[in-house]
């Protein structure tokens, strides 16, 4: 078995950007998941724009307990400098609206969409037929 050598990686931090939300360093040892050729190992679950801009997480999962709105999706995508997975409904928001919000999120640049339980399989199927980005389904 080969001994894994630790690479010396130069780190640059500015005075104003030195205080960020850092994921645990052990995350770098995991395999992660590859989406569209980009390996993602860490996800930050937030809609807080200040946190989105000040983290070293590889991606953001942005889900909130209100009816999704295209303007909120746009603001989250614009704020993120890493891939973002946006909530598009599934609780109160159902049916064609979920599919339309998913398509809107794809057009705005989201890497994926999140639907909440109790989203029906039919809605997930319709979403899959309409968009070409990953769909994350939460469970309770």
Where in this protein do the model-derived segments appear?
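Short, acidic/polar
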Residues: 40-51, 95-104
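Active-site cofactor/substrate anionic-group-binding motifs, chiefly glycine-
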Residues: 59-61, 73-97, 101-108
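Hydrophobic faces of well-ordered beta-strands that scaffold small-molecule active sites
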Residues: 31-39, 59-62, 84-88, 113-115, ...
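Active-site-adjacent beta->alpha loops and helix N-cap segments on the catalytic face
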Residues: 64-79, 93-98, 116-132, 140
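A short alpha-helix capping/helix-coil boundary motif
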Residues: 26-29, 51-54, 78-83, 103-104, ...
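N-terminal amphipathic alpha-helix/helix-capping segment at the start of soluble metabolic enzymes
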Residues: 1-44, 73
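Detector for Asparagine
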Residues: 8, 19, 54-56, 100, ...
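Catalytic domains of carbohydrate-active enzymes, especially glycoside hydrolases
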Residues: 47-67, 104-112
């Amino acid at each position: 078995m080969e001994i894994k050598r630790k690479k010396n990686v130069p780190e640059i931090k500015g005075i104003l950007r030195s205080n960020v939300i850092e994921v645990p360093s052990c995350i770098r040892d995991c395999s992660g998941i590859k989406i569209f050729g980009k390996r993602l190992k860490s996800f930050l679950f937030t809609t807080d724009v200040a946190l989105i801009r000040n983290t070293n997480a590889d991606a953001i999962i942005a889900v909130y307990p209100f009816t999704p709105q295209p303007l909120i999706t746009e603001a989250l995508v614009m704020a993120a400098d890493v891939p973002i997975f946006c909530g598009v409904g599934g609780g109160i928001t159902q049916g064609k609206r979920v599919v339309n919000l998913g398509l809107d999120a794809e057009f705005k640049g989201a890497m994926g969409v999140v639907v909440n339980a109790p989203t029906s399989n039919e809605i997930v199927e319709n979403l899959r037929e309409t968009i070409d980005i990953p769909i994350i389904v939460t469970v309770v």
